[in-house]
Amino acid sequence: MGFHIYEIKARQIIDSRGNPTVEADVILEDGTCGRSAVPSGASTGINEAVELRDGDKSVYMGKGVLKAIENIKNIIAPELEGMSALNQVAIDRKMLELDGTPTKEKLGANAILAVSMATAKAAAKYLGLKVYQYLGAYKANILPTPMCNIINGGAHSDNSVDFQEFMIMPVGAKTFSEAIRMAVEVFHTLKGILNGKGYATSVGDEGGFAPNLKSNEEACEMIIEAIKKAGYEPGKDIAIALDPATSELYDPKTKKYVLKWSTKEELTSEQMVEYWSKWVEKYPIISIEDGMAEEDWDGWKKLTDKIGHKIQLVGDDLFVTNTSFLKKGIEMGVANSILIKVNQIGTLTETFEAVEMAKKAGYTAIVSHRSGETEDTTIADLVVALGTGQIKTGSLSRTDRIAKYNQLIRIEEELETTAEYHGKNVFYSIKQKQIKSL
């Protein structure tokens, strides 16, 4: 028949931060090969699936992944060889059974995910389909509104900005290609503004600029200036999205948020909610990810009650792409969106289950990269297959980020007249869809 798995290979390669990661090849009986490499995060949720590292400080500073690779070769491969690559659910469930732990700590989520994604790519190639067509079938025609990271702070840079990501979303574009053009123009305009003010234009892990700004507010003000100077209207054409990654700022002992890179100010949950409420009134912000810490469920509830009808509130560390945590959030009325990171959960099957649960509850879903990426473009196909309408995959620089955007441009071209770009209409979880304009 040809579609059964004949062999699985695995190797240690290097990601965009110079750290080792896992790449797997799934080879079918007829010689068809699917290859995939897994990403890695810098700021990680405490409930994420475990990324297995070797821990030998004398090799790659302890970040080697040879244990994960051995698990693929010695445990996963013997069980999967002979199985049908066309049954993704069976493949993923077999690996979950082999691991047997809630966080995949035995085999490593990096081992499991590499094989899961490579299997899907092999199956698609065997059937003569693109990955997005194979995974999404007839529904795979929505191109995502991108969240483009243009200023980095926090754990993704070495500057005085507390919040990790300041992003732009071209909500007024008519096509994905136009959205990328708009974002690129703002990116280059911002570079000119930073140069003019004497700020460095070096970039962080995700390709955004990492200037040593005077305050967190200055980042928003610079972005608004760049949007206007590029010829667009803030809010109407291009909105701002934030990922403050506040779990990195939260002290669970004092239950306070410490703005440790800027003012050293300590804020209670209530004060943090008010902080974001004022920002939403002041700036054209449409989305805030991890506006409260993952342990601070009460704070999350207060934030959702306060501004959840106005903007998209995205749970990343809060939900870690896990249906158990998402279910809790839905029942509590916490957040209105989930960030989807395949390596947080570890298999494509579980990823699809999380998106399905979110959609049924009226939550939006955003497919996301990690700060440590590779040239693998699977998430570009995945976002179209899932039809979530939003992607977060870094800035308009660094090949590891651009590769995903370029793949989406190709997909849009392939879809021709059936391609859809929903722009600001992707925010179906918000009751009040009016984005503040300036």
Swiss-Prot record:
Its main location: cytoplasm. Pfam families: Enolase_C (PF00113), Enolase_N (PF03952). The lineage of its organism: Bacteria, Pseudomonadati, Spirochaetota, Spirochaetia, Spirochaetales. It catalyses: (2R)-2-phosphoglycerate = phosphoenolpyruvate + H2O. Gene3D superfamilies: Enolase-like C-terminal domain (3.20.20.120), Enolase-like, N-terminal domain (3.30.390.10). The active site is at 206 (proton donor), 341 (proton acceptor). Mg(2+) binds at residues 243, 289, 316. Belongs to the enolase family. It comes from Borrelia garinii subsp. bavariensis (strain ATCC BAA-2496 / DSM 23469 / PBi). Pathway: Carbohydrate degradation; glycolysis; pyruvate from D-glyceraldehyde 3-phosphate: step 4/5. SUPFAM superfamilies: Enolase C-terminal domain-like (SSF51604), Enolase N-terminal domain-like (SSF54826). This is Enolase. Signal peptide: none annotated. GO terms for biological process: glycolytic process. The gene is eno.
